[in-house]
Amino acid sequence: MTLGVFHQVYTRPKATEEAIKSFRQFHPDNPYVLICDGGKSFHRISKRYNCLYVHEEDNLGYRDHTHSSGIYGMTKEEVLEWLRRFRLACTLCNTDHILMMEDDILIRGEIHVPEEWEFAGQAKPGNLLQEPFTDYLTEKYGVEWNVNYYGTGGGSIFNAKTFLENYERVIKIFDEEFDYIKENLCGNLGWVDVWMPMYYFLCGKQYRH
């Protein structure tokens, strides 16, 4: 099993460095893709910790319920761009699995991922995926759900090869269905801990935690 890292950052260099440092303590040579989300340059930190650095001009970010736009999370266009960046990281790392790192994640030991794991996050039975949403994907795309909740936030691990192999097919579904699902079936689809389970369930995979 080989493991790479996808880490999107913005304007918190001190937190970013602590997160990278914690990973490098146990995995000094693993490929690590650092993507700046339209913020300040992280080139110096990237060079110091042997990361592959990509600077994107557009900031994706998130919006909470209080945002003046009325948008919750990300829009379809922003999610598609996020997935493009994730695909880039998977391609650059060229590993079996990829860790979705965030600034508030600290690694406390060497990471060993079972080869059969497809996507793994937190066990959060309280984060229910509503039946109209799950039923819709089951009836239209044959999705089989081994859990009815979501939880793939920072620190989650994904099978990178599965992501790449299914990208063109699943991206087409996201492009066609995202707005309808977000507006009618799953209002929090604009958050990564929801859209990534949707992606992998559309690949026919099971959630681990």
Regions found by a protein language model. Name each.
Residues 1-21:
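N-proximal low-complexity "stem/linker" segments adjacent to membrane-targeting elements
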Residues 14-16, 39-45, 129:
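Short, charged/polar "capping" segments at the starts of alpha-helices
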Residues 21-30:
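Short, acidic, metal-binding catalytic loop of nucleotide-sugar glycosyltransferases
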Residues 35-93:
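Active-site-proximal specificity loops/subdomain of glycosyltransferases
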Residues 79-86, 103-105, 189-197:
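Conserved glycosyltransferase catalytic-site signature
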Residues 95-106:
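Short beta-strand-to-loop acidic/aromatic patch adjacent to the donor-nucleotide binding site
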Residues 107-184, 189, 197:
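Conserved catalytic core of nucleotide-sugar-dependent glycosyltransferases
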Residues 197-209:
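Catalytic donor-sugar/metal-binding loop of nucleotide-sugar-dependent glycosyltransferases
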